[in-house]
Amino acid sequence: MSQAGPGGGQASIASITDRVTPVSLGAPVSSVHFLRDNAVFVGAEESVAFVDKAGEIGRVATHGGGILCAVSDGKRVVSGGDDGKVVAVDAEGEVAVLATDAKRRWIDCVALHGDGAFAWSAGKTAFVRSGKGEEKSLEVPSTVGGLAFAPKGLRLAIAHYNGATLWFPNMTGTPESLTWAGSQLGVTFSPDNRFLVTAMHEPALHGWRLADSRHMRMSGYPGRVRSMAWSAGGKFLATSGADSVIAWPFASKDGPMGKEPAMLAPLPVRATVVACHPKQDILAAGYEDGTILMVRMEDGGELLVRRNGNPPVAALAWNADGSRLAFADEQGDAGLLAL
């Protein structure tokens, strides 16, 4: 990987654009996930597109309207829609309706747990259904902004206005409240289960050290953080929202408190989405001008995956072993990179 400074042109960055298989989806994309050898592109309306290694497209209808959220555990893609349904599609393209909101409210957020449990939200209510089919619900003070399961145990983080709630659905005790003024829109646990981080409506992140609820404020962004990804070992949290990838250090017991973040892959435009390699300290970053870079976190070395002059990048995902990268922009122009 070669390096280019903030003013460096794309011509100075080593290119692997010739390894990309282009895919034209013809419709906006909100996220992409891998199920076995297929990249599954989640559209904004009604269906997902299965794309194989050769770039052949097969569409699967999942919702009767807009798709508002989607997550994957590598076995299935679970999505929520404005039809009030939580829907799963597996690697074979088989579709199952997992839940339907009794009031047909929009399903705003979804989350998956390793043991087969899943969570979803509608309005102020978060729901969890265990792998055994037992369903629980919890109402929080305001509309749910994000959901995330802890890496250990059946514990759900629920982001909302003025903080987050930590809930053990299988326990009768009062859920734990973590407070911070403002609207929290996304939430993630660190892989070692020591920290919780939320993305705020304002251009900032907020975090808590779970052992003592100590606050961690991560600010200075010119725009909202819409994408967060943990590095393979959990040492860094990579984020969008600035004209470089901001990577906060989380290796020490204090996390990023008192430390400066790394600023990787600077460009004249903002990063829109980030995805960390599952095995190595490498990330992919997409930008407002359509550029996609692959970046080595150790020294900032860069490879050009896609040139600028395109709509903003909307989705990035690695497959399980990190040998393939899928991407798409807001207009549905996509690609598959084989390494």
What would you call each of these model-derived segments?
Residues 1-339:
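WD40-repeat beta-propeller superdomains and closely related acidic/aromatic-rich repeat-like regions
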